[in-house]
Amino acid sequence: MAKILVLYYSMYGHIETMAHAVAEGAKKVDGAEVIIKRVPETMPPEIFAKAGGKTQNAPVATPQELADYDAIIFGTPTRFGNMPGQMRTFLDQTGGLWASGALYGKLGSVFSSTGTGGGQEQTITSTWTTLAHHGMVIVPIGYAAQELFDVSQVRGGTPYGATTIAGGDGSRQPSQEELSIARYQGEYVAGLAVKLNG
């Protein structure tokens, strides 16, 4: 049995929705145990509420537990072309795992969201830098998801990982195409994890 963690941060719910689609795809793979968790919110609750943050039910992960999984699929929104402070703070607490090599050889993949599309790929590839320092095997999705070839509508999705475009005011929710790409990413990573660890 390969253990897959879908680990995300989501303020307004876009990445949370994508995380559930990623997990749905991963659960299609026989021999994959899939768990969804989120990183802790660092914003004071009253500020989070004033900013329109969405309450989420996923349990909160600890950095130490990352070592328990064979593959980790990270979901992070984009803040100024990079991951937000909440995800950065969480990953900055993995120094002990780095020192012991606890994540070495584990699969790592990333999906993201942006307001208007700016920085979605950079957010994914800059997250890869942290995964590389841990010796994780980075898993992009390439162009195997056929939805990536559809240019008839505004949509997220890159060969690096699934993405969604939320719109400047956050009102646009992930489209069916974007969710399909996210499901593909989950299924693809889980399939590799089972082959390597199942």
UniProtKB/Swiss-Prot annotation:
One of its GO terms (molecular function) is NADH:ubiquinone reductase (non-electrogenic) activity. It is an enzyme of class 1 (oxidoreductase). NAD(+) binds at Y12. It comes from the Bacteria. Gene3D superfamilies: 3.40.50.360. FMN binds at residues 10-15, 78-80, 113-118, 133. Keywords: Flavoprotein, FMN, NAD, NADP, Nucleotide-binding, Oxidoreductase. Disulfide bonds: none annotated. Binds 1 FMN per monomer. It catalyses: a quinone + NADH + H(+) = a quinol + NAD(+); a quinone + NADPH + H(+) = a quinol + NADP(+). GO terms for cellular component: membrane. Substrate binds at W98. PANTHER family: FLAVODOXIN-RELATED PROTEIN WRBA-RELATED, FLAVOPROTEIN-LIKE PROTEIN YCP4-RELATED. Belongs to the WrbA family. This is NAD(P)H dehydrogenase (quinone). It comes from Salmonella paratyphi A (strain ATCC 9150 / SARB42).
